[in-house]
Amino acid sequence: MSIDPINPTPIPPPASSGFSLANVIFATLIPTIIIVAVAGYFYITAIPENPGNLDFQIGLADRVIGDRTKLSEAFTDANGDLVADTPSDASKLVDPEKLLISHVASADSIEQAKKWQPLMDMIQKTTGKPVEYVILTDTNEQLSYFKEGKLHIAAFNTGTVPAAVNLTGFVPYCSPVTTGSTTGYQMVFIVPKESAINTPADIKGKTLAVTNVMSHSGYKMPLTYLRDEFKMYPGKDYDLRLSGGHAQSIKGIQSDGYEVAAVASDLLSSIQNAGGIKEGDYRVIHRSDTNQPAAPWGYAYNLKPELQDKIKQAFDAYTDPKFQPISYAKDWDYIRKVDSAMLNWNSK
């Protein structure tokens, strides 16, 4: 049985008999599900599950980076911090009656809404405005929402931040403190506990599970690392499987569905602490030397300055977790270099 590129451990619906409202709803939704599945098929095949080396290299930059590496001409950056300036024209400033917020788009967005309710309460307290969580499961959809003003406050995954800054006017402000007084995580390669794969060099001839093409630790960083350190290219020296997310990659390793996966260490720890995987279920065969910045929270560049300040006050006062202010120009320098390396893929 082949592994589904989106769900490595598919679980069939439980068998049932007799009439039930759920069965009726299920039956009426079949045509819709088919349409969505077909659309999803064409989306997935636009980024091949096991891309041939030549086609992969030719299309890599456009698929992953495209025009996302430079600040859009719609914005200005007078102070050179690489982030869109707040408009000087008062008519271009917004002061919404209700603040719309969303954490990193993921399959567990509903659970994230519950997790971040205390933060929303804090923001409501400091701004005096009601705060509503927007459920989003797709990164590109989250980018679109932010660009269209359907989100005012958000956290984007580390690899998506440059696109959010350059295309949508996202202003990163802070990242959660993960250990002691530090923020961030490492990219790790993990394998099933009984795997014969012991080093990154052993990935040659194997299949690497990656999360999605916008992910830094789940896609861009591992591919550039294997290329630069071992001259290994996907589609030529090893194959790829798109899992759809870090949690899916980790579950695939736990069930022996994947040979090796690239994931973020903080998400691995979080899932392990929640009982989703045990330490004895996997082994880490490589951990990146550099500490990657954790997914940052930020706000829209065109919010009124006084509203921006009140939002910052909420993050500064919040303690579970604590947040640490970040510098996009400094802290995302390495991420931007990886993006540049992807753009110059064929030159290596």
Show the residue positions of the predicted features.
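Periplasmic-binding protein-like
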Residues: 104-105, 179-188, 276-312, 325-345
